[in-house]
UniProtKB/Swiss-Prot annotation:
Bias type Low complexity, positions: 39-49, 165-177, 400-417, 604-614
Coiled coil feature spans: none
Organism the protein comes from: Emericella nidulans (strain FGSC A4 / ATCC 38163 / CBS 112.46 / NRRL 194 / M139) (Aspergillus nidulans)
InterPro entries: LYSM1-4, LysM_dom_sf
Source organism, top-level taxon: Eukaryota
Stated name of the protein: Uncharacterized protein AN12072
Basic and acidic residues bias (residue ranges): 25-34
């Protein structure tokens, strides 16, 4: 080994002295320099298949570095990848190279380390290329584009083919980025246009959204409304229950198996109402748990069929006069005997008779009626019979003669014993509120049997007896030429009741207002008479009082005049008028002229001298 290295050194010195000044650049050197990688990469690869593992590191320092040669542009870049025929396996490890360079031989340990580092670096580079993608033309250290592209590893190749194959099928995505493109105003305008387009293209048929609340409907909803009205117009079956005196809402609902809430809704009961206020109540058949068996009524028998098949109406016991009573017949006859009976006081009969059924636990058959379904779910009622009025309505239970009730003469003729019954018939009248309530002529409701006649509404005079216009000249003229428009005359017995309204009110009126007015008038009359009597008495007795007074008192004069308060009883005034010889006693301390509880000054004193004089007089009286 040492002999080899020594011969190499002598040969190198000889070649340097002989060949170095005459060194020429051959085409092989140019080809080698163009195909060699730059030193920055640190790795140079060869395309020959004969050298799969032999590589030289450009970073390894050479003991005899040569002068750098300026690169020559490649005319044929593809030649860099062509295999070289003159490459030899031993050139990279030492000895002479084709370009005349001498390389120091590596030891076996150095060669193994270089091979290990090359393998590790190539593996790391393959992993990095697979993650970052294939190598593209990168700029080299001298600024030119990289001509040699490394062959991609297998994972990168597979990933590239997979990506290419994935993009060849399926729907193509948007070619231009549309998210956040344009200004904010343009995006808002686009959103508004999209919403308007969706609104115009939407389905306007409301049949898909029947349960939603529409605030505005158009002509397209007519079909839906007609369909809903058809459903509401369908008839439902109900049990018609005749209310008994012992029935309660809870008992009836338990007996029929119906919920109390449904029962109250169908019949229009408030929570505080009682079932006794009705004569008939309805219970929906589909909401009740009990079912009945149909019963054939006697009225439904065909009268045109043969006589032998007709059921016998004779008593089986032998009586041919009185037919045998049956529960069905008794029930039907009882109901048919009352054709004019109103089922409810508040409203008319809303059901139509359908059939009769026999229910277990019921002594008599139960009637089944048919009512519109909208009547079962509407509450409260829209109209009551008590407030409805009709001119052709017959008056039941009272006379046709109208009853007169006015403020000036509240006396009513008691021509019928049913008048009190009629007053108690109305639920709203004060007479029916309690057993001890007193009748009030002023606030009593006018009976509905009073017919209005004539033109106009009448005058506001307190002496009006009947509704209608007053009997003036115009009314008399129309009464002569148009008898139908003439106002009706007062009843014959009304003349005897006319007279002084105050006298009638003071004698026969039971109204509190009339009594109060009469008492007030009487008190005013008595007070006025008492005042006049006192004034006359004071003027007549002034001379006698002056004579009885002492001289100094007479000189001062009696300037303090007094009068009695309002409301003095008549007996006091009569006593004052009867006593002609009465003189005031000024010597007593309890005189009526100085009593502050019952007297008041008519002319109050304006000077302190007068008050001082009155004080001295009082002191004299007290002594």
């Amino acid at each position: 080994m040492s002999s080899r290295s020594g011969s190499a050194d002598t040969f190198t010195q000889r070649s340097d002295s002989n060949l170095r000044p005459r060194r020429l650049i051959s085409l092989d050197d140019v080809r080698d320099n163009n195909g060699r990688q730059p030193s920055s990469s640190g790795i140079s690869t060869t395309g020959s298949s004969e050298l799969p593992t032999l590589r030289s590191r450009g970073a390894t320092p050479s003991p005899r570095p040569s002068r750098n040669v300026s690169p020559i542009p490649m005319g044929h870049p593809s030649r860099a990848t062509q295999p070289r025929s003159d490459a030899r396996p031993g050139n990279s490890l030492g000895g002479f190279t084709p370009n005349g360079k001498y390389q120091d031989p590596f030891t076996e340990s150095s060669r193994a380390a270089v091979d290990f580092l090359d393998a590790s670096w190539s593996s790391l580079q393959g992993i990095a290329s697979s993650l970052l993608g294939s190598d593209t033309a990168r700029p080299t250290s001298n600024g030119g584009p990289r001509s040699h592209a490394r062959k991609p590893s297998r994972p990168d190749y597979l990933a590239k083919h997979r990506a290419v194959s994935t993009s060849t099928w399926g729907p193509s995505g948007p070619t231009t980025p549309e998210i956040g493109a344009g200004t904010q105003d343009e995006r808002q305008a686009m959103v508004h246009a999209k919403k308007m387009e969706a609104l115009l293209l939407a389905d306007t048929d409301p049949s898909w959204n029947l349960n939603s609340r529409h605030k505005r409907r158009d002509s397209n909803d007519r079909t839906v409304q007609s369909r809903a009205d058809t459903d509401q117009d369908e008839e439902a079956l109900v049990y018609v229950h005749q209310v008994q005196p012992t029935d309660t809402i809870t008992g009836v609902t338990i007996r029929y198996g119906c919920q109390a809430a449904i029962f109250r809704k169908v019949n229009g009961f408030w929570p505080s109402d009682s079932i006794q206020a009705r004569k008939t109540v309805l219970l929906p058949v589909d909401c009740c748990s009990i079912k009945g068996r149909p019963v054939k009524a006697r009225e439904e028998t065909d009268l045109l069929q043969d006589v032998p098949s007709r059921p016998s109406i004779e008593d089986p016991s032998g009586s041919s006069i009185v037919p045998a009573p049956s529960p069905e017949k008794s029930t039907f006859s009882r109901i048919s005997e009352q054709p004019g009976t109103e089922p409810e006081a508040e409203s008319d009969q809303i059901w139509k008779h359908e059939s009769w059924v026999q229910i277990d636990g019921f002594a008599e058959p139960v009637e089944i009626g048919r009512v519109p379904r909208r009547a079962l779910g509407f509450f409260p009622r829209t109209r009551r019979k008590s407030v409805s009025y009709s001119d052709s309505e017959p008056v039941r239970g009272r006379l046709q003669t109208p009853t007169i009730s006015t403020a000036s003469s509240p006396i009513q003729p008691s021509s019928s014993p049913n008048a009190d019954q009629h007053d108690s018939y109305h639920a709203g009248s004060p007479a029916s509120r309690g057993p001890g309530s007193k009748p009030k002529g002023r606030h009593r409701r006018r009976p509905s049997g009073l017919e209005l006649s004539g033109t106009g509404v009448g005058t506001l005079d307190r002496n009006v007896n009947l509704p209608g216009p007053a009997m003036d000249g115009l009314s008399k003229f129309f009464a002569q030429h148009l008898p139908t428009l003439a106002p009706k005359q007062a009843p014959p017995n009304f003349d005897s009741l006319s007279g002084n309204s105050s006298t009638v009110a003071s004698i026969n009126s039971t109204s509190l207002d009339s009594i109060g007015g009469a008492v007030e008038g009487w008190v005013r009359k008595i007070t006025a008479r008492a005042k006049s009597s006192i004034n006359d008495l004071q003027q007549g007795t002034s001379s006698s009082q002056n004579q009885a007074m002492p001289p100094e008192t007479r000189r001062r004069g009696f300037s303090d005049l007094i009068e009695l308060e309002d409301g003095v009883e008549s007996r006091n005034s009569s006593g004052l008028l009867a006593g002609t010889g009465w003189k005031p006693d000024l010597t007593r301390s309890g005189s009526g002229y100085v009593n502050g509880a019952n007297l008041r000054e008519r002319f109050p004193s304006a000077s302190p001298s007068t008050s001082r004089t009155r004080t001295g007089l009082d002191r004299t009286k007290g002594d």
